[in-house]
């Protein structure tokens, strides 16, 4: 964990100072709202908008990860074992350290909110080239 930090409360506008994350295959998008680039140390927060038929690239993190399905539906798929779990509006899911997964949108698309705890700095160094591999 990072060293000493001042205890402060900050309001973060999700439309300002975020980082586009090149993790979506399709017409949707993913943005980091709370990430190391704006001072996050203990957790990250991402908004992932997947349109119908979109999916994320295969993902894995050096930290635990939790997401909430704000709207829509889809599937979370384990890459290593091929397991799949349906996701509906209001669902939450946890990804363990090092587990590989992919999120796939259903026919209405889906919006997710979540991220890693603690922050996984390597995640923000992904390039479009690395994601396409």
Describe each model-derived feature in a short phrase.
Residues 1-42, 57, 123-133:
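A short, N-terminal "cap"/entry segment at the start of jelly-roll beta-barrel domains
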Residues 35-44, 51-68, 80-81:
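A short beta-loop-beta micro-motif enriched in histidine and acidic residues
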Residues 42, 94, 108-126:
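A short hydrophobic beta-strand segment most commonly corresponding to one strand
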Residues 57, 76-78, 112:
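Short hydrophobic/aromatic-rich beta-strand segments that constitute the beta-sheet cores
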Residues 81-98:
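Short acidic-glycine-tyrosine-enriched beta hairpin
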Residues 104-105:
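Asparagine-centered strand-capping/turn motif at beta-strand->loop junctions
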């Amino acid at each position: 964990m990072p060293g000493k930090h001042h205890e402060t409360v900050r309001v973060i506008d999700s439309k300002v100072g975020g980082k586009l994350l090149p993790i979506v295959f399709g017409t949707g998008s993913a943005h980091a709202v709370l990430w190391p680039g704006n001072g996050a140390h203990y957790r990250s927060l991402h908004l992932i908008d997947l349109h119908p038929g979109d999916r994320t690239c295969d993902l894995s993190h050096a930290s635990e990860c939790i997401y909430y399905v704000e709207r829509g539906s889809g599937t979370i798929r384990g890459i290593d074992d091929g397991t799949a779990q349906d996701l509906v509006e209001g669902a939450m899911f946890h990804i363990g350290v090092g587990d590989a997964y992919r999120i796939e949108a259903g026919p209405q698309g889906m919006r997710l909110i979540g991220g890693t705890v603690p922050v996984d700095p390597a995640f923000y160094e992904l390039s479009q080239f690395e994601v396409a591999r």
